[in-house]
Amino acid sequence: MSDIDFGYTKDHARKGANAKLPEIQCWENQYKRDYDIRIELPEFTSVCPKTGLPDFGVITIDYIPDRLCLELKSLKYYLLEYRDMGIFMENIANKILDDVVKACKPKKAVVTGDFTPRGGLRSVIVAKYEKK
């Protein structure tokens, strides 16, 4: 292991993870059977909490609804709040998943953040939830 200190702190790591964001609204699912819903935001942006530089990527939300479906306009406003937020990519995928699960309580959900390469490294973060 290298002894190089890259200057990351616990504050950097936690930044944005507990941010208060607009509520994601839902509407009543009309079907009892399982079916898949995929929502993509191809122009997602946020800010690196350490460098202040913008991060770009594609956020994909896949879920199997239970009683509720996500309302897209409120979801869009929710996702736009990340634009000026300092938050690590790993926290983005996990926070979105937590907030989606809290809002609509799906049977299953996966949030994928596919971020534009930075320094030659591409990051794809996949956060998963399955109702027990």
From Swiss-Prot:
Highest taxon in the source lineage: Bacteria
Pfam families named in the record: QueF
The reaction(s) this protein catalyses: 7-aminomethyl-7-carbaguanine + 2 NADP(+) = 7-cyano-7-deazaguanine + 2 NADPH + 3 H(+)
Function: Catalyzes the NADPH-dependent reduction of 7-cyano-7-deazaguanine (preQ0) to 7-aminomethyl-7-deazaguanine (preQ1).
Name of the protein in its database record: NADPH-dependent 7-cyano-7-deazaguanine reductase
Organism: Elusimicrobium minutum (strain Pei191)
Subcellular location: Cytoplasm
Family, per entry: Belongs to the GTP cyclohydrolase I family. QueF type 1 subfamily.
